[in-house]
Amino acid sequence: MHSHDFRDAEEFRGKNVVVLGSSYSAEDVALQCHKYGAKSVTIGYRHNPMGFKWPNRMKEVFHLDRLEDNKAIFKDGYEQEADAIILCTGYLHHFPFLSEDLKLKTGNRLYPPKLYKGVVWQNNHKLMYLGMQDQFHTFNMFDCQAWFTRDVIMEKIKIPDLSLIHI
């Protein structure tokens, strides 16, 4: 399963869960599984561990090497029985449904260009991108962007002439 499809940790109660990844989604999924009673949670990282002092039944290990039967075997030789494997391996923004002139194209995810207040597309005020910032106050930022967007749609906030503003 990919973290994109993760909805409820309840289904992992009493199970040995292996989480592959070492960023926000992996942390969230691993802790949810632990909180809802997973028998064990093993977090496999590829580059750097998250480095937290994990609760009992949670462990970080270096890089999955292979799967054999129902075991996850890691590069350091550690083996963990796996009832479930959850991939928290990141994602790429992809907008195949938009024409090229409307697609956000940037490697800068801290403050993407051409988005007024980080949301409204400069060349078309009816197009709004939410959640484009990369891992910076993520969920608080999503909430703020949703409220801002709501107020723009309800015409409580007026968008200035963006052709006069360098974004």
Would you name each region that the model predicts?
Residues 1-162:
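Flavin (primarily FAD) cofactor-binding/catalytic cores of flavoenzymes
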